[in-house]
């Protein structure tokens, strides 16, 4: 049985002292009804805070799970440089310069978020049909940024692979490509693939010719040709993850334009309207959020 002292002490601690404080702070008359009302409000606020904390915890868990669903290979079609320049009253070359600056910035963001391979469609086979001055500008930009980015590539141990038909490339650019590839060939874990004079159809044709020559030379039998054998001949064999999980094409155009035709069989395709020079970290995070909400079935029923 509680003593009288205990009862009085409990009353003072739980009701009277808080009641006096409430009465003075809120300028309300002291009464048991007001004290109980205040206690009910505090309890309600505490419950609301608990509920918010629980929701935050749930969101945090979802974000953690989302980070585990990162694309291993992200491919990007860099589109919108000219339109970006036109909107600002600038020349085409200035648009390409802005796009070239954005290239390595976005690659850094991708690697920082856990992606292993990044493929950039920088110059298609069809791009040779553009005005001569524009083509020369693009070739000069490739040389400029390959050279200037070398310190970063080495310090961050990023392997560079340039894929495509090299027969038309300027000698100076070819020499630089070979130098960069040689300097970074031993790096593992991060692979930056730059497609220059690349065509998905060309890639498939050269792979088929290579397999045909191996059959002709007696190195393999026709029966040995399967998907794995084909993938070993494609230009993306330079990567541990040759098939993109996510392909992004900026500028709102919704086609892959002869890029990675074989490799994109089950790739998630994302088409933001933002132009390439404006595609930054925030836009990439939006692409990742979209990707993480996709249910990838690979032709199976899940």
Swiss-Prot record:
It is an enzyme of class 2 (transferase). Its EC number is 2.5.1.-. Its main location: endoplasmic reticulum. It is a single-pass membrane protein. It is found in: Endoplasmic reticulum membrane. Keywords: Endoplasmic reticulum, Membrane, Transferase, Transmembrane, Transmembrane helix. GO terms for molecular function: transferase activity, transferring alkyl or aryl (other than methyl) groups. The chain crosses the membrane at residues 2-22. Coiled coil: none annotated. Catalyzes cis-prenyl chain elongation to produce the polyprenyl backbone of dolichol, a glycosyl carrier-lipid required for the biosynthesis of several classes of glycoprotein. This is Dehydrodolichyl diphosphate synthase 5. The lineage of its organism: Eukaryota, Viridiplantae, Streptophyta, Embryophyta, Tracheophyta.
């Amino acid at each position: 049985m509680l003593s009288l002292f205990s009862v009085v002490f409990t009353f003072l601690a739980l009701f009277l002292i808080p009641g006096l404080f409430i009465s003075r702070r809120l300028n309300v008359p002291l009464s048991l009804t007001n004290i109980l009302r205040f206690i009910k409000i505090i309890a309600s606020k505490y419950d609301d805070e608990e509920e918010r904390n629980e929701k935050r915890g749930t969101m945090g868990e979802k974000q953690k799970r989302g980070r585990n669903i990162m694309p291993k290979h992200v491919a990007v079609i860099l589109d919108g440089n000219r339109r970006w320049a036109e909107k600002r009253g600038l020349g085409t070359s200035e648009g390409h310069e802005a796009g070239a600056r954005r290239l390595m910035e976005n690659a850094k963001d991708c690697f920082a978020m856990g992606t292993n391979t990044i493929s950039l469609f920088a110059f298609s086979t069809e791009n040779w049909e553009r005005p001569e001055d524009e083509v020369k500008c693009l070739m000069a930009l490739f040389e400029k940024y390959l050279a200037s980015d070398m310190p970063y590539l080495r310090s961050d141990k990023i392997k560079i692979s340039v894929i495509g038909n090299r027969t038309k490339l300027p000698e100076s650019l070819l020499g630089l490509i070979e130098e960069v590839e040689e300097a970074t060939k031993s790096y593992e874990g991060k692979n930056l693939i730059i497609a220059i004079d690349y065509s998905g159809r060309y890639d498939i044709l050269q792979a088929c010719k290579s397999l045909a020559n191996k059959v002709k030379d007696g190195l393999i039998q026709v029966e040995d040709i399967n998907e794995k054998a084909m993938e070993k001949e494609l230009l993306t064999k330079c990567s541990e993850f040759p098939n993109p999980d996510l392909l992004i094409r900026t500028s709102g155009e919704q086609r892959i334009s002869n890029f990675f035709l074989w490799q994109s069989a089950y790739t998630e395709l994302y088409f933001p309207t933002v132009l390439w020079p404006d595609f930054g970290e925030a836009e990439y995070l939006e692409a990742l959020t979209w990707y993480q909400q996709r249910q990838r079935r690979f032709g199976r029923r899940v």
